[in-house]
């Protein structure tokens, strides 16, 4: 992976293991720094990608009605604690002028934005803004539901608690009926 200093991550993980009183040379931990470095390269791969790249290919289709891809699974890492949060994203847009993108591109944009140290609010807004800026639709609505391990494993310790964030752009900002339609389809 570009921009990833594996040796530096491995060194830092060894220091953490030592700082908590573990022996990084014991059998179960000897390869842990290497594994963690490799994992970080994978789970943070979106850091050096632009989600807008996924919307470069568009199709002309006589369709100016709602498009919704729901229940897109994702995982990310909380930038405050570097522990996972995971859930589903629902991405809706109304094409303008018949300009549509491949459905998988919506899921790829979610994945790109999620694969970095992140906040759920930022994932939601960045996906919406990327679609709005590249496809110029009538509107975009993104709803993200996630469970945060920083609330499950530590602190308040509330397993199962879900956080829901929304980002509305264009027509969805003012058209309550359109917004309600998306929410109804997500729930249905």
Swiss-Prot record:
Keyword set, alphabetical order: GTP-binding, Hydrolase, Metal-binding, Nucleotide-binding, One-carbon metabolism, Zinc
Family annotation (InterPro entries): GTP-CH-I_C/QueF, GTP-CH-I_N, GTP_CycHdrlase_I, GTP_CycHdrlase_I_CS, GTP_CycHdrlase_I_dom
Protein name as catalogued: GTP cyclohydrolase 1
Similarity comment text for this entry: Belongs to the GTP cyclohydrolase I family.
GO molecular function: GTP binding; GTP cyclohydrolase I activity; zinc ion binding
Record's catalysed reaction(s): GTP + H2O = 7,8-dihydroneopterin 3'-triphosphate + formate + H(+)
Matches recorded under SUPFAM superfamilies: Tetrahydrobiopterin biosynthesis enzymes-like
EC number in record: 3.5.4.16
Pathway: Cofactor biosynthesis; 7,8-dihydroneopterin triphosphate biosynthesis; 7,8-dihydroneopterin triphosphate from GTP: step 1/1
Subunit structure: Homomer.
GO cellular component, one term: cytoplasm
GO BP annotations, alphabetical order: one-carbon metabolic process; tetrahydrobiopterin biosynthetic process; tetrahydrofolate biosynthetic process
Entry keyword Metal-binding: yes
Protein species of origin: Geobacillus sp. (strain WCH70)
PANTHER family: GTP CYCLOHYDROLASE 1, GTP CYCLOHYDROLASE I
UniProt-listed Pfam families: GTP_cyclohydroI (PF01227)
Origin organism lineage: Bacteria, Bacillati, Bacillota, Bacilli, Bacillales
Annotated Zn(2+) binding sites: 78, 81, 150
Gene this protein is translated from: folE
Key word Glycosyltransferase present: no
């Amino acid at each position: 992976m570009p921009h990833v200093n594996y040796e530096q991550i491995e060194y830092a993980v060894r220091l953490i293991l030592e700082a908590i009183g573990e022996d990084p040379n014991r059998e179960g931990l000897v390869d842990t720094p290497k594994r963690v470095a490799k994992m970080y390269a994978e789970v943070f791969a979106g850091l050096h990608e632009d989600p807008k790249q996924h919307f470069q290919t568009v199709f002309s289709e006589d369709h100016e009605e709602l498009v919704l891809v729901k229940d897109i699974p994702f995982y990310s890492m909380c930038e405050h604690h570097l522990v996972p949060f995971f859930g589903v994203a629902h991405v809706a847009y109304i094409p303008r002028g018949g300009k549509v993108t491949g459905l998988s591109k919506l899921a790829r944009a979610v994945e790109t934005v999620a694969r970095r140290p992140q906040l759920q609010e930022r994932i939601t807004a960045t996906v919406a803004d990327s679609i709005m800026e590249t496809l110029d639709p009538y509107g975009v609505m993104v709803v993200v539901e996630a469970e945060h391990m920083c609330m499950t494993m530590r602190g308040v310790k509330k397993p199962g608690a879900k956080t829901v964030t929304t980002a509305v752009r264009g027509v969805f900002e003012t058209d309550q009926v359109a917004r309600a339609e998306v929410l109804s389809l997500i729930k249905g």
